[in-house]
């Protein structure tokens, strides 16, 4: 029987990003891809955030992040805010450090009671760090397009690694006017991205405001992607088209992103909403090896 049988979970969302938080700090078990997919079939989610016992002194937990296709991700900003809210409400803490595959994340209570800030770390721009399948000296724009050569629908994205690979396509109009559900999977799995990529359409309203929409690697079309918001804000600032503190409008809500000048860390601030608490039925994992 799966170690997840009869285990409790919490369903939350980070501005529309559907999140399941599973605290396994008292259980020595690593969730398998089959188990992650079984959970998604019963409790639909974009990301499954699994708290495991801390591996490093001074950290609250080691966080494994699963997409709904069973693959693992290095970062999920919206999911981290949900984890932070759960931990803070249980312990009364106002700050904590978590370890993820992408590194250490410092988190704290935001400027209002319903806001939480996650330090998403330092963005990476080198073509091998993103990674890309071929060399590009300047990743502010790379050669990639969808549509006819002489009239591409989308072209020349900026690429950033924000704990996972991101490609940001800049558009002049409404981000909802593009068929991201059609283009997203093609671009996510393009050969230029050996580890696949998150695909974002972004419109710069002004230097303090960007609207965006994301096809999330391993999860599909989503109402929100925190790491994509960070990547988009950083990419816009690299192009000198936006300030280092910017308001991001996503289909699910608003995030404030700051690319801190003194150390290049990216800070993401937003809400985390509780939906319900439940317990996994044993039969959910009956077909899981």
Curated annotation (Swiss-Prot):
**Complexes and interactors:** Homodimer.
- What's this protein's function? Catalyzes the stereoinversion of LL-2,6-diaminopimelate (L,L-DAP) to meso-diaminopimelate (meso-DAP), a precursor of L-lysine and an essential component of the bacterial peptidoglycan.
Q: What class of enzyme is it?
A: isomerase
Family listed: Belongs to the diaminopimelate epimerase family.
Q: In which pathway does it act?
A: Amino-acid biosynthesis; L-lysine biosynthesis via DAP pathway; DL-2,6-diaminopimelate from LL-2,6-diaminopimelate: step 1/1
> Sorted alphabetically, which Pfam families does this protein's record hold?
DAP_epimerase (PF01678)
Q: State the species of origin.
A: Bradyrhizobium sp. (strain BTAi1 / ATCC BAA-1182)
What is the E.C. number?
5.1.1.7
Top-rank lineage group of the source organism: Bacteria
Give the chief site where it resides: cytoplasm
Task: Provide the GO MF annotations for this entry.
Answer: diaminopimelate epimerase activity
Quote the PROSITE patterns the UniProt record gives.
DAP_EPIMERASE (PS01326)
* Protein keywords: Amino-acid biosynthesis, Cytoplasm, Isomerase, Lysine biosynthesis
- Residues the record lists as binding substrate: 17, 47, 67, 77-78, 164, 198, 216-217, 226-227
Q: Which gene encodes it?
A: dapF
Check the record and name the HAMAP family matching this protein: DAP_epimerase
Q: What's the protein here called?
A: Diaminopimelate epimerase
Q: Which reaction does it catalyse?
A: (2S,6S)-2,6-diaminopimelate = meso-2,6-diaminopimelate
Signal sequence annotation: none
GO:BP terms for this protein? lysine biosynthetic process via diaminopimelate
Q: Which SUPFAM superfamilies match?
A: Diaminopimelate epimerase-like (SSF54506)
Q: Where in the cell is it found?
A: Cytoplasm
Annotated site (Could be important to modulate the pK values of the two catalytic cysteine residues), which positions?
166, 216
| Cross-referenced PANTHER family | DIAMINOPIMELATE EPIMERASE, DIAMINOPIMELATE EPIMERASE, CHLOROPLASTIC
Gene Ontology CC annotations of this record: cytosol
Active site residues of this protein: 76, 225
């Amino acid at each position: 029987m799966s170690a997840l049988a009869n285990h409790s979970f919490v369903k939350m969302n980070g501005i529309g990003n559907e999140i399941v938080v599973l605290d396994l700090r008292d259980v020595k078990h690593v969730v398998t891809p089959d188990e992650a997919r079984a959970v998604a079939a019963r409790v639909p989610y974009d990301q499954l955030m699994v708290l495991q016992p801390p591996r490093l002194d001074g950290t609250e937990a080691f966080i494994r992040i699963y997409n709904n296709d069973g693959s693992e991700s290095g970062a999920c900003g919206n999911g981290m805010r949900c984890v932070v809210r759960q931990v803070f409400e249980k312990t009364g803490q106002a700050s904590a450090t978590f370890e993820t595959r992408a590194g250490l994340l410092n988190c704290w209570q935001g400027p209002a009671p319903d806001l939480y800030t996650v330090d998403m770390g330092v963005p990476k721009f080198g073509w091998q760090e993103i990674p890309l399948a071929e060399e590009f000296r300047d990743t502010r724009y790379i050669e990639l397009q969808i549509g006819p050569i002489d009239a591409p629908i989308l072209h020349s994205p900026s690429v950033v690694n924000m704990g996972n690979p991101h490609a940001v396509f800049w558009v002049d109009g409404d981000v909802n006017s593009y068929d991201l559900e059609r283009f997203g999977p093609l671009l996510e799995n393009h050969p230029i991205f050996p580890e696949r990529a998150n695909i974002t359409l972004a419109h710069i309203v002004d230097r303090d405001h960007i609207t965006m929409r994301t096809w999330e690697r391993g999860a599909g079309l989503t109402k929100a992607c925190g790491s994509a918001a960070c990547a988009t804000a950083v990419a816009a600032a690299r192009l000198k088209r936006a300030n280092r503190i910017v308001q991001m409008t996503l289909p699910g809500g608003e995030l404030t992103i700051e690319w801190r000048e003194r150390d290049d860390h990216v800070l993401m601030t937003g809400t985390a909403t509780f939906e319900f608490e439940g317990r996994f039925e044993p039969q959910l994992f009956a077909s899981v090896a």
